[in-house]
């Protein structure tokens, strides 16, 4: 390092982790602390430009620290707490826009830490500005909370279970997303579309969590911006690892869809490019135990987010590649995750369950539509079996006949039921049906298809599905198959009361079970609506759909379930005939007449897929899966 450079230096040590008395030059080998954390080491030298946030930014951070009202009581030195006082506290803020002084240099995002990701700073708009990521090989800066030494890395904090438990962060589980948004305020009078949101006001996890709930499971993942056309479930909020600007998305809400899509996707592509540079597995020996599980969790989350971006952009192959990458992590580290799950905090465990369930859901539905076998099929099977076996009790251990023992701290009982409204047993049957469809496709290609073997395998799956239908029907206040007309409309209203929430999920699973039967018959007999078994299964599916629809109206629940029901809707509606088609037309019409909260783009895609199948004659019916693949409309099925 030259003398002139040394003269400009105001502090000695590493600018990234603040490790004092570093013996290497800037651009040289990384320091031990940075190497252990797996982040890019800045070295030392003159104060980097990005270190000076300015007086306005510091004042805003100090104000938000007071607003959060959630101080931490840690046994750290008072001098360290005083040094870290100007930094944002645990209740992180997501600043979509910036004040008038920072508008020219781009927006800044501050995201709170939870002992894993840490509080990080991300800047956009400047080509030379660094990007931060919890596990990436690029620039990183920790904003230590009061009472936490700046010399400690975020993974050090995670590993220090005795000194600090992530659950001690006192996140407010009782507050709702709406209340948090109400408390948010604009950071600039001239940018009303930008808001600052206190992420600590959002529940980290809720037992009533549904796929459309805008909730931050990790402090690094900010709430999903409402009203994003067609993709409410895409994690398009301020995720530091994917470098997605929450403010940019909010600003783009008022722009035409075409213009908004281009700019938003540019941010997503930039984030995915940075994420691809991250190492696929922990490199340092310190990342063992809880650190390794947390590292895998971050990658499962990021690969899921990347797949959502890809499916939104219509790149189905890249979406499948990202899903396969996340599935490979689960496949490779399944034993470690199961064995070390007890070391994860309650919040981390539930976050892992959330992203794993969504990954399995998307992979199974995508495989069914593409007639392929998921890469991590055996892992999915074990997790789905564990969820199914523990559905009715509180047992924490269940043994599968197809694999090793699976422990529910990884995926707790009723996880699929709570997060998707569909039981794991039903999704397991869909996985089996998808594997059967892929098997037939391969046998036909090789010219060795045995109809007897095909029917025999289909009968085994059908017997399991019929058993699930009988069990689910017994849970309903009134059987959904007792109707007053052939159209499938129920003759009596359903019960009202606190059990309605469970009833909705039961009918939801029932719809999928009937659709799996229809899909099985289609695999064996082809897409022919004239097959009696297909017509009968569609009539039963109509009854379940009407019960769910009536329950939805009684509950006053918002629309938006059409993406979850997209797969069974296409299976049944595409092969419907006569009066059955009128029922599905009415279902679409009711969805289109909603209050605008539903994803109209998805509804139009469903309508287009089904009408293309109806346009052909009954003797030469078109398979809806072929329509989806040709039109590249896979995104309508994924969450």
From Swiss-Prot:
It is found in: Nucleus. Pfam families: Fungal_trans_2, Zn_clus. One of its GO terms (molecular function) is DNA binding. Keywords: DNA-binding, Metal-binding, Nucleus, Transcription, Transcription regulation, Virulence, Zinc. Gene3D superfamilies: Zn(2)-C6 fungal-type DNA-binding domain (4.10.240.10). InterPro entries: Fun_TF, Zn2-C6_fun-type_DNA-bd_sf, Zn2Cys6_DnaBD. This is Transcription factor phomR.
